[in-house]
């Protein structure tokens, strides 16, 4: 699958995870509704599904990975920033096939696209500190 299809999968995952975080609906229902309502022809749907289920299943673990590097409480994070960080941390912790720098750069781009004005700087700061602890030898 092309890198652009993976990028689109991440973009869709941010949107679906945002919905899941706010609604607390079952992730399978969120996935079904998202795929039924959105144009996903240029999306790596398998990767989208993996990101959704992986982040939802591991959300407490992923939150634990980010907490030491946050400048504020986890509960004070914006939902977009939380979704972006969870995706990046999932890729760093569970997807060795995703290069270290790709996971970070994609997260920064997602934060620029979907987050508040300076959220990409916040995401970059957290990941710059967390990533070496997650993948110490894989820069």
Swiss-Prot record:
One of its GO terms (biological process) is DNA-templated transcription termination. It comes from the Bacteria. One of its GO terms (molecular function) is RNA binding. One of its GO terms (cellular component) is cytosol. Involved in transcription antitermination. Required for transcription of ribosomal RNA (rRNA) genes. Binds specifically to the boxA antiterminator sequence of the ribosomal RNA (rrn) operons. Belongs to the NusB family. Keywords: RNA-binding, Transcription, Transcription antitermination, Transcription regulation. SUPFAM superfamilies: NusB-like. Coiled coil: none annotated. The keyword Metal-binding does not apply. InterPro entries: NusB-like_sf (IPR035926), NusB_fam (IPR011605), NusB_RsmB_TIM44 (IPR006027). This is Transcription antitermination protein NusB. HAMAP family: NusB.
């Amino acid at each position: 699958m092309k890198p652009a299809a993976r990028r689109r999968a991440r973009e869709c995952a941010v949107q679906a995870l945002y919905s899941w975080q706010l609604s607390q609906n079952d992730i399978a229902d969120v996935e079904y509704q998202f795929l039924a309502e959105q144009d996903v022809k240029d999306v790596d749907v398998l990767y989208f599904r993996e990101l959704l289920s992986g982040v939802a299943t591991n959300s407490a673990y992923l939150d634990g990975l980010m907490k030491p590097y946050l400048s504020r409480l986890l509960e004070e994070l914006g939902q977009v920033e939380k979704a972006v960080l969870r995706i990046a941390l999932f890729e760093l912790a569970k997807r060795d096939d995703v290069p270290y720098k790709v996971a970070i750069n994609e997260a920064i781009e997602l934060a620029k696209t979907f987050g508040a004005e300076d959220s990409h700087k916040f995401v970059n700061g957290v990941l710059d500190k967390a990533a070496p602890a997650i993948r110490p030898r894989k820069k």
